[in-house]
């Protein structure tokens, strides 16, 4: 029978769980079939194991208790260290890179705490990985299986060992802990260069800003009014990295839709050129307004409640409820990491109806995919995944992301065309239900006021999800950064949503929005528009780990995180409810009316941006 190999590090507890050897491993059989059909390798048997690495001190008794809790004795065997007893040709271990969200690891940490009846330290974590034991392959084939099928090098690591190498080695106790900076610092960015130098700077920092936009930012910070305000705040004429990153996010194509709003000259064949003042105004807003006029003419009233200014559209349904609907794309992230990108897409679009008005309850999801043929057999451009791998990963990510957060799927479609080889089109949509009246006020209305507290609710801030807005606004190539990809955490999001619905019905917050493509930068920046300013203290924001630079804290996005505006009178009741529901809620600043977004870190101002310029 399988036996445990002793641990070699007191700081890491390693648990390995496998299907009992006399039983069929359905997951392994599925991997084996996929290897044959996708890679054309005549592979033998594949067995799988789940590996958990728990950082932090556990006693021998505690480790054994957790091992037993993580194992179904009817179907599984497990051991502290590693299981032995099965023969195979190669072992392929697949895990996450440092800083990438590990949703199963998060849930496993909660399970460890529940099992032990005590909280683990904040710095402790559970890191998960999967071990594939493969028969009938050579080393080069094992490498292909690892890199072309089992792992995504953008977000995952692989370790490949022959049976003899694996048996001779001690248990792998390495954990993908993020290496923190010694002293997170704020840098000043020099914008005095030529247009070519400014464009190179923009590309290097993944800002997705043109040279014209870079010059505009430079000139603004040089202006007299700006300089006087900056001197009083202890800042110079050059922007800090916090300010430049915030502006790049806010001005990105992803957030500003500059192409949709630009003047377009369109000519088809020999026809006369057509000048379109704005694709958005002409074909999106214009069509909506035309339909509304027709409805008013026919029925004498409009059923549109709120369109084009909140996170999703709101239309009348009955006397008690409005319908909220939002569809968005998640193309670039799905091209890099099909499963994680698509899961992020669906849980991301979930948060838009939830952040519309004072908060809509989610009803159902929809989806639509456009890929190249899954039977494609030609060469792939560098950095691109095979269409079939993208399709299968996207579909599984969308299904898992929706169903695991309690929002079922209503309908969907797929389309295949060779033009989607370079970049897939991934639609994700959500329908929500919004009460006409909530706590004595119209459900579709919201807005922060000066003096309201800024409260961050849900998942903590990490290195993933950084530059999501600017990355998705640029052309996709092989240099795409790992930080731009975030992995959704449906369980954390579900817990947060349930808490927020309860807080909504009790009237415990005044306004809400999501931490979308720019994290706190986008949510606080958007919410500060109505009151006219905000002071945001980045040091108060809860982090997954130490060492994040201030601009990273500001920009890191997450699907399971929301920002609230809360009156001083309701802060106590809101935080008490959050504690009872085991949802993290933290006051990180205050809305003001002085016309500036002020960002603080380390007891000083590190960002001062005029709200009108932003």
Feature locations, PLM:
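A short, contiguous, amphipathic alpha-helix enriched in charged residues
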Residues: 528-532, 536-540
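Repeat-solenoid scaffold signature
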Residues: 562-582
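Short catalytic-loop micro-motif centered on adjacent basic/acidic residues
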Residues: 510-513, 563
């Amino acid at each position: 029978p399988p036996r445990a190999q002793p641990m070699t590090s007191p700081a890491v507890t390693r648990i390995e769980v496998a299907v009992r050897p006399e039983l069929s491993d359905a997951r392994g059989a599925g991997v084996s079939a996929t290897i044959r059909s996708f890679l054309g390798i005549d592979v033998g048997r594949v067995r799988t194991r789940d590996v958990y690495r728990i950082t932090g001190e556990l006693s021998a008794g505690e480790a054994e208790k957790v091992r037993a809790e993580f194992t179904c004795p009817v179907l599984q065997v497990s051991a502290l260290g590693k299981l032995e007893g099965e023969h195979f040709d190669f072992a392929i271990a697949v895990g996450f890179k440092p800083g990438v969200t590990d949703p199963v690891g998060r849930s496993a940490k909660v399970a460890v705490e529940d099992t032990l009846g005590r909280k683990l330290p904040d710095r402790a974590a559970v890191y998960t990985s999967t071990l594939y034991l493969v028969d009938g392959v050579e080393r080069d084939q094992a490498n292909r299986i690892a890199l072309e099928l089992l792992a995504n090098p953008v977000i995952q690591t692989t370790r490949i060992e022959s049976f003899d190498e694996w048996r001779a080695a001690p248990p792998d106790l390495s954990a993908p802990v993020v290496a923190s900076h010694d002293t997170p610092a704020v840098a000043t960015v020099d914008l005095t260069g030529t247009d070519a130098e400014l464009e190179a700077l923009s590309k290097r920092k993944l800002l997705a800003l043109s040279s014209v936009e870079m010059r505009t930012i430079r000139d603004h910070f040089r202006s007299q009014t700006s300089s006087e305000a900056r001197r009083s705040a202890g800042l110079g004429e050059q922007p800090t990295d916090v300010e430049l990153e915030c502006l790049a996010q806010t001005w990105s194509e992803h957030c500003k839709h500059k192409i949709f709003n630009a003047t377009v000259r369109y000519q088809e064949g020999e026809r006369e050129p057509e000048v379109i003042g704005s694709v958005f105004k002409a074909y999106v807003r214009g069509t909506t307004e035309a339909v509304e006029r027709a409805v008013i003419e026919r029925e004498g009233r409009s059923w549109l409640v709120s369109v084009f200014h909140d996170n999703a559209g709101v239309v009348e349904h009955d006397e008690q409820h409005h319908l909220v609907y939002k569809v968005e794309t998640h193309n670039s992230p799905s091209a890099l990491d099909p499963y994680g990108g698509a899961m992020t897409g669906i849980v991301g679009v979930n948060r838009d109806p939830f952040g519309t008005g004072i908060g809509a309850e989610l009803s159902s999801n929809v989806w639509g995919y456009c890929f190249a043929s899954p039977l494609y057999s030609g060469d792939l451009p560098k950095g691109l995944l095979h269409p079939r791998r993208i399709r299968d990963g996207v579909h599984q990510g969308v299904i898992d992301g929706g169903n695991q957060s309690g929002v079922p799927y209503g309908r969907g479609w797929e389309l295949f065309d060779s033009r989607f080889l370079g970049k897939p089109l991934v639609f994700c949509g959500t329908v929500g239900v919004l009460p006409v009246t909530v706590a004595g006020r119209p459900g579709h209305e919201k807005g922060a006021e000066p003096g309201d507290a800024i409260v961050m609710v849900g998942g903590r801030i990490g290195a993933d999800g950084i530059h999501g807005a600017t990355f998705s606004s640029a052309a996709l190539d092989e240099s795409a950064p790992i930080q731009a990809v975030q992995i959704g955490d449906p369980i954390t999001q579900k817990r947060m949503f349930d808490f927020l619905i309860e807080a909504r019905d009790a009237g415990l917050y005044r306004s809400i929005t999501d931490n979308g493509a720019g994290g706190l930068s986008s949510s606080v920046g958007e919410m500060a528009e109505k009151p006219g300013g905000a002071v945001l203290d980045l040091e108060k924001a809860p982090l997954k780990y130490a060492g994040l630079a201030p601009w990273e804290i500001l920009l890191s996005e997450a699907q399971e995180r929301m920002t609230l505006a809360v009156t001083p009178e309701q802060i106590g009741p809101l935080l008490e409810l959050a504690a009872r529901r085991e949802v993290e809620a933290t006051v990180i600043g205050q809305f003001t009316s002085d016309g500036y977004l002020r960002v603080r870190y380390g007891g000083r101002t590190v960002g001062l941006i005029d709200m009108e310029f932003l």
